[in-house]
Amino acid sequence: MAVSSCARAFPSFECRSDAEFSGGIPRHDIPNSGKASILSHGSSVHGLSSLIYRFPPNFVRQLSIKARRNCSNIGVAQVVAASWSNNNSSPDFTPVAKAVDAAAAAAAAIAPVDTTVVNEDVALVENETCNDQNVQFDSLPSMKYASFLNSDGSVAIHAGERLGRGIVTDAITTPVVNTSAYFFNKTSELIDFKEKRRASFEYGRYGNPTTVVLEEKISALEGAESTLLMASGMCASTVMLLALVPAGGHIVTTTDCYRKTRIFIETILPKMGITATVIDPADVGALELALNQKKVNLFFTESPTNPFLRCVDIELVSKLCHEKGALVCIDGTFATPLNQKALALGADLVLHSATKFLGGHNDVLAGCISGPLKLVSEIRNLHHILGGALNPNAAYLIIRGMKTLHLRVQQQNSTALRMAEILEAHPKVRHVYYPGLQSHPEHHIAKKQMTGFGGVVSFEVDGDLLTTAKFVDALKIPYIAPSFGGCESIVDQPAIMSYWDLSQSDRAKYGIMDNLVRFSFGVEDFDDLKADILQALDSI
């Protein structure tokens, strides 16, 4: 469930929608390639409210107005989740409930919500307009934000959330809907839902209102029609591969990548007859050769890659692959949507481990994949079968984390670039891998397709395995851990952290030397991090 597109699933009289913030954001830098439906300036939808915030006309509780306003976010969300109804027949409620409904009707009379349907592929149900995609609200074209909300930082804060607030709560934050299933008042409603005449949620594995908000937020940042959230980045990668590559198919991937992704491609996909060509990230000739010699279904790579931060020319490889009918999926975890817009560069799909920069606080596991509705729907269908659904509490943590995404990424970009330059000049550092450095083999590509170079720097210490471990142990600020992208700095020695089960010679086949260090810069003060790294280098 990515983008809520039920234009009038419930009457609008109880919505406090802000028209200036409704829907997605126009991505003016995205070519008209069918990957995102961007509205012209002449057509717009105002006041469109996300489904969880619309209250059906018979939704009442015997609460005073004051009590309703004081409901907690979670409590209100649970009440909302339990009250989906389009039944227009109203029983005889108490005077208090009637007073609340009267107040709601009066408020709506003062500020009615104007909803203009822009999607012609709709069904009319009891004077309500709802798309025919059932509860998978992916078919709505992007909506227009206010002109002053055109920066990624503002979008990361507001996208998907200021889509309308019910009068029960004036909460700024998005509620957490903790439920495993959603009920129907009567069988006729269930039949309408099954026959796609009524929009609703059904089961927790298929979608959650809190998760929808996060999917809309990520879609707005990526300029995507649809986004699907999953329980981890690896879940997103594996489900994408299983959904889009047929049995007996062929993919192209790169030498430098996350090891677990490589293991899945090398050991699991062959069981379905799927083969792979592995190329250097910069070897365009090898890609062309594979495209000409084989029926390639998909090109899948990271950019920047893990751990050497190699960069793929996304625009070029997308052009080459599309000419041969192959799809392109870019794992942009190291870049973030703020530093790189893979879809705008021509990729069909962009994937993230939201555990990293998007969540940004080292406290949640999640993955996401964004792109055109058709492709994401294919992945979604398999995901609903396999499971791996994201818990709504985890979705809330990422929503909260993304409100500071632009601040964190700006700090991490700056710290990483400055430290990369210092490390490159240090006599106890043999080599530095960072796309922001002119010495990086794909620096020219990174400059072309990235606005910032990320918060991770890899480098080789002048020493062996034990000397490098001594350097790591001498650091005071970063944690020794296997992740990156959070507020806290993290350091690891890949030869030990990720490849310790392989011999030194086998590690070397992947370029993993004993003296390699991967440093993820957090948001600590630059001078503190600089002093810590320099003292650790002085200790070896």
Swiss-Prot record:
Q: Which gene encodes it?
A: CGS1
Q: Which reaction does it catalyse?
A: O-phospho-L-homoserine + L-cysteine = L,L-cystathionine + phosphate; O-succinyl-L-homoserine + L-cysteine = L,L-cystathionine + succinate + H(+)
Q: Which Gene3D superfamilies does its entry note?
A: Aspartate Aminotransferase, domain 1 (3.90.1150.10), Type I PLP-dependent aspartate aminotransferase-like (Major domain) (3.40.640.10)
Query: Where mainly located?
Result: plastid
Source organism per entry reads: Nicotiana tabacum
Q: Describe cofactor binding as the record notes it.
A: Binds 1 pyridoxal 5'-phosphate per subunit.
Question: Which residues does UniProt call coiled coil?
Answer: none
* Record text on subunit structure and interactions: Forms homotetramers composed of 2 homodimers.
Which residues belong to the signal peptide in this entry? none
Origin: domain of life: Eukaryota
PANTHER family registered for this protein in UniProt: CYSTATHIONINE GAMMA-SYNTHASE, CYSTATHIONINE GAMMA-SYNTHASE 1, CHLOROPLASTIC-LIKE ISOFORM X1
Transit peptide: which residues?
A: 1-78
Names of required cofactors: pyridoxal 5'-phosphate
- N6-(pyridoxal phosphate)lysine PTM positions: 356
Q: Which residues bind pyridoxal 5'-phosphate?
A: 203, 205, 233-234, 258, 353, 355
Tell me which SUPFAM superfamilies the record gives: PLP-dependent transferases
Which family does the record assign?
Belongs to the trans-sulfuration enzymes family.
Q: How is its activity regulated?
A: Irreversibly inactivated by DL-propargylglycine.
Which GO BP terms sit in this record? methionine biosynthetic process; transsulfuration
The protein's name: Cystathionine gamma-synthase 1, chloroplastic
EC number from the UniProt entry: 2.5.1.160
One annotated GO molecular function is:
pyridoxal phosphate binding
